[in-house]
A protein has these predicted regions:
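A positional/architectural concept
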Residues: 2, 7-9, 13-51, 58-59, ...
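Amphipathic, well-ordered alpha-helical segments in soluble domains
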Residues: 19-29, 53-60, 94-98, 122, ...
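Secondary-structure edge/capping motif, primarily at the C-terminal ends of alpha-helices
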Residues: 27-37, 61-68, 99-106, 130-137, ...
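Conserved amphipathic alpha-helical segments that form helical-bundle/coiled-coil interaction surfaces
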Residues: 39-63, 77-80, 129-163
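Hydrophobic/aromatic-rich structural module bridging two neighboring secondary-structure elements via a short loop
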Residues: 63-86
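A cross-kingdom feature marking solvent-exposed beta-strand/loop segments within repeated
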Residues: 67-74, 108-114, 171-174
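A structural feature that tracks compact, well-ordered secondary-structure segments
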Residues: 85-103, 130-131, 142-146, 153-160, ...
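Conserved small/polar residues in nucleotide/adenosyl-binding loops
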Residues: 203-206
């Protein structure tokens, strides 16, 4: 029969999976938003859900630390959970930032560079894989997420060069900067996915 402590750790596991699923959802929605889908309010609502879930998990972690005496491995799991939810919360914030930028992009009929769409797909994949790595305790998947970040960084650098050239030609400066910031937020989301993968790896150190 599971102890109260074991049940709390299992609840922590379930809550992180739930928060991770919300992050996957909000990133997929932001990807749709930059393509013109009418889902901006849904992004904002999902970001609020992520914020609420972060507070719930923080409270659970504090209860575990205050009322239990976790051994080293369990303590690592709780510490990693606190780091992971911080990164997940930032993913929600950056998806909301992308949603804000997508309003101007859509209203002004700005053409989205193909590479931004590809970058969005890469970051969606990284977030999904980082959550899957946690669920499956898969260290190989953690390493894949970390390696994939190089491709996202390369794509961001290419986008910077492409937008600089387009702005030099005839692209409106504000439109160019909004597209650049959209790509920058995606690059940061990739960084947060890497942080989550690293937290998962830390949890399962022997």
């Amino acid at each position: 029969m599971a102890t109260h402590f074991e049940r709390q750790l299992e609840e922590l596991h379930v809550q992180i999976i739930t928060m991770g699923s919300l992050c996957e959802k909000v990133i997929s929605l932001s990807n749709r938003a930059i393509r013109g889908d009418k889902c901006i309010q849904e992004i904002f609502d999902t970001d609020k859900e992520i914020d609420t879930k972060e507070r719930e998990i923080e409270n659970l972690c504090m209860r575990i630390l205050l009322h239990q005496q976790p051994v080293a491995r369990d303590l690592r799991e709780v510490s990693a959970a606190l780091k992971m939810i911080s990164d997940m919360e930032r993913i929600g914030d950056q998806a909301s930032d992308i949603a804000d930028l997508s309003k101007f992009i859509e209203e002004n009929h700005v053409q989205i560079p193909e590479l931004i769409g590809k970058m969005a797909e890469m970051t969606v994949g990284m977030v999904t894989e980082s959550v899957d790595a946690f669920v499956k305790r898969d260290l190989d998947l953690c390493r894949k997420v970390i390696d994939d970040d190089d491709q996202v960084d390369d794509a961001f650098n290419q986008i910077k060069e492409e937008l600089a050239e387009l702005m030099y030609q005839n692209l409106d400066a504000k439109a160019g900067l909004d597209l650049l910031m959209t790509a920058k937020y995606m690059e940061r989301i990739g960084d947060h996915a890497v942080n989550i993968a690293e937290s998962v790896s830390y949890t399962h150190l022997r």
